[in-house]
């Protein structure tokens, strides 16, 4: 029996196992050594049990898979060939690990006899992603000495560990030949005989029973709910954010929200008004802070958390540490709505009114300072004007803009907002946005900085695969404007931090055959958006602005609000 046939049998069992674990998207890069895996993924697609996506750039492919997994909330498989193709997945693996996004990385490998002997495209791939995967499976070369049941069991157990997210790396060595295997030879191979009934049924090999862990009410909750408290809400899935705002309002507690929280802010612009030392000192009089979620963007929110020394509780639905300030705290590993049910509120009047007064003052002052020109700050402040009312998702890239959006906007509750704030890199943002469009099957709006766009230009090719409207805002402030916030000499900052490029993006759009517009006013933008939303294709909207506009407005708002005198 040809080795090419058994390579395919081995790959069939791997992908059949992953399919039963919820994998329906297979992201495939070109390569010969991964042929057995690629052809079996194609077979699943032909049978209506999966969708294959392709991209020529493995780094972008990894982030594309990350985006699909974020939006679909299901594991996504990535298939790549051996060599440095595998290493290009590392940034996406890091981001997935930091944010608990389920990815399954399938790296084809040379067989052991071709390693460390000068063979082409053969590198050391076993455990190459170090501690970032939750499981690293180094499979042997395909051999009938290992039963199909063993292979399924190994993969099934790893997938069970992935139920709360994270990355699984499966390294699969294949010896040649890799081609010319007949489907009938594969399906009728004796090695598969003991699992034929399993292959005809859509069920997991190992049936894990759900563990229902009831949230226990804190034994001193009746006392703590009478105290002065603050609710801090960080990054949460939209389905976990329900009920938090109402609960906080009933308690009369201050609630501070991150733009990633999917909770409508009752005290918007927190990253601005927390610069006010008078109000911050009064907030520090709180007796308890309860944190839902994590990954706070705002610098002032993080400074407040670092300063707070009182009782601290964290509600987070995984085992990860999410307290960079190392409070002595009480940890509840629970979904927020389960925790809220176990900790009923006590209706009280607000214990502190100054934040509300300051937030209202901020609203008027921000509107005045931002003005009516089309710039970073006005886009962030009026971000809801850019978005369709329904059936759409928003992706915010890692640049100055995400900080402005967090500080200046009031997003609607439960509007789907995605970010890559695990490692907060600027790599792979376009690819992630394209994946989110695929995973959500909804209209996409993405706000991405110019340097981030230049870093991931290859990924514009992915947008040709979309079948829905997608709007990519490229915020072109001629380099890394986020570094304008640093206390560095201007000349040094320009050359070594900002790195101005003096480029524009119309020719990039033409290269990838995407629509392009460059509006100069809000009226121009309204016309462009109306056209873009009517087309089932991608439009690049370049907002070219003065380099320092956004950072200057941001710094000025923080300075002015920081010294404002607010009476109640």
UniProtKB/Swiss-Prot annotation:
Q: What is this protein called?
A: 2-succinyl-5-enolpyruvyl-6-hydroxy-3-cyclohexene-1-carboxylate synthase
Q: What does this protein do?
A: Catalyzes the thiamine diphosphate-dependent decarboxylation of 2-oxoglutarate and the subsequent addition of the resulting succinic semialdehyde-thiamine pyrophosphate anion to isochorismate to yield 2-succinyl-5-enolpyruvyl-6-hydroxy-3-cyclohexene-1-carboxylate (SEPHCHC).
Which Pfam families does the record match to this protein?
A: TPP_enzyme_C, TPP_enzyme_M_2, TPP_enzyme_N
Q: Subunit notes for this chain?
A: Homodimer.
Q: Highest lineage ranks of the organism?
A: Bacteria, Pseudomonadati, Pseudomonadota, Gammaproteobacteria, Pasteurellales
Q: Which organism is it from?
A: Histophilus somni (strain 2336) (Haemophilus somnus)
The note on the cofactor says:
Binds 1 thiamine pyrophosphate per subunit.
Alphabetized UniProt keyword annotations:
Magnesium, Manganese, Menaquinone biosynthesis, Metal-binding, Thiamine pyrophosphate, Transferase
Class of this enzyme: transferase
Which biological process, per GO, is one annotated for this protein? menaquinone biosynthetic process
**Is the keyword Zinc assigned to this protein?**
no
What PANTHER family does the record tag this protein with?
2-SUCCINYL-5-ENOLPYRUVYL-6-HYDROXY-3-CYCLOHEXENE-1-CARBOXYLATE SYNTHASE, PROTEIN PHYLLO, CHLOROPLASTIC
* Reaction catalysed by this enzyme: isochorismate + 2-oxoglutarate + H(+) = 5-enolpyruvoyl-6-hydroxy-2-succinyl-cyclohex-3-ene-1-carboxylate + CO2
- Which Gene Ontology molecular-function terms are recorded? 2-succinyl-5-enolpyruvyl-6-hydroxy-3-cyclohexene-1-carboxylic-acid synthase activity; magnesium ion binding; manganese ion binding; thiamine pyrophosphate binding
Tell me its cofactors: Mg(2+); Mn(2+); thiamine diphosphate
Family classification = Belongs to the TPP enzyme family. MenD subfamily.
- The record's EC number reads 2.2.1.9
Which pathway, per its entry?
Answer: Quinol/quinone metabolism; 1,4-dihydroxy-2-naphthoate biosynthesis; 1,4-dihydroxy-2-naphthoate from chorismate: step 2/7; Quinol/quinone metabolism; menaquinone biosynthesis
């Amino acid at each position: 029996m040809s080795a090419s046939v058994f390579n395919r049998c081995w790959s069939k069992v791997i992908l059949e196992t992953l399919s039963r674990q919820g994998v329906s998207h297979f992201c495939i890069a070109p390569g010969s050594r991964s042929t057995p895996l690629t052809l079996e993924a194609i077979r699943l697609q032909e049978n209506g049990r999966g969708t294959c996506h392709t991209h020529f750039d493995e780094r972008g492919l990894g982030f594309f898979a990350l985006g699909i997994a974020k939006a679909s909330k299901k594991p996504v498989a990535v298939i790549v060939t051996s060599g440095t193709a595998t290493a290009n997945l590392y940034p996406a693996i890091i981001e997935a690990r930091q944010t608990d996004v389920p990815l399954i990385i399938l790296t084809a490998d040379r067989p052991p006899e071709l390693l460390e002997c000068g063979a082409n495209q053969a590198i050391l791939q076993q455990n190459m992603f170090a501690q970032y995967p939750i499981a690293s499976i180094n499979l042997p070369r395909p051999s009938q000495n290992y039963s199909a049941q063993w292979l399924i069991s190994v993969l099934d157990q790893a997938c069970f560990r992935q139920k709360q997210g994270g990355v699984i790396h499966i390294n699969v060595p294949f010896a040649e030949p890799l081609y010319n295997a007949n489907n009938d030879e594969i399906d009728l191979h004796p090695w598969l005989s003991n699992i034929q009934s399993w292959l005809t049924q859509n069920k997991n090999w190992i049936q894990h029973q759900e563990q229902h862990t009831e949230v226990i009410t804190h034994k001193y909750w009746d006392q703590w709910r009478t105290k002065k408290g603050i609710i801090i809400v960080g990054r949460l899935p939209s389905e976990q954010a329900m009920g938090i705002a109402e609960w906080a309002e009933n308690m009369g507690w201050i609630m501070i929200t991150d733009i990633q929280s999917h909770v409508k802010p009752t005290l918007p612009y927190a990253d601005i008004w927390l610069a006010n030392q008078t109000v911050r000192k009064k907030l520090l009089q709180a007796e308890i802070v309860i944190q839902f979620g994590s990954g706070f963007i705002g610098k002032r929110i993080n400074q407040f958390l670092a300063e707070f020394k009182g009782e601290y509780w964290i509600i987070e639905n995984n085992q990860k540490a999410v307290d960079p300030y190392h409070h002595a705290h009480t940890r509840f590993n629970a979904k927020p709505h389960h925790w809220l049910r176990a900790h009923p509120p006590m209706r009280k009047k607000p214990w502190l009114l100054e934040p509300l007064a300051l937030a209202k003052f901020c609203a008027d002052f921000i509107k005045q300072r931002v003005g009516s020109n089309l710039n970073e700050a006005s886009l962030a402040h009026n971000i809801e004007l850019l978005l369709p009312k329904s059936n759409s998702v928003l992706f915010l890239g890692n640049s100055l803009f995400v900080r402005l959006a967090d500080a200046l906007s009031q997003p609607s509750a439960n509007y789907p907002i995605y970010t890559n704030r695990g490692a907060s890199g600027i790599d792979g943002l376009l690819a992630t946005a394209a994946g989110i469009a695929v995973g959500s099957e909804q209209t996409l709006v993405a706000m991405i900085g110019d340097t981030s766009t230049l870093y991931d230009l290859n990924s514009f090719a992915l947008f040709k695969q979309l079948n829905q409207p997608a709007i990519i805002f490229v915020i072109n402030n001629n380099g890394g404007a986020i570094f304008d916030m640093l206390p560095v000499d201007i000349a040094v900052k320009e050359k070594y931090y900002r790195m101005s490029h003096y480029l524009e993006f119309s020719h990039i759009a033409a290269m990838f055959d995407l629509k392009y517009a460059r509006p100069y006013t809000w009226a121009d933008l309204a016309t462009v958006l109306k056209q873009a939303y009517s087309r089932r294709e991608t439009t690049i909207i370049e907002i070219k602005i003065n380099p320092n506009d956004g950072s200057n407005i941001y710094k000025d708002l923080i300075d002015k609000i920081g010294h404002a005198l607010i009476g109640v």
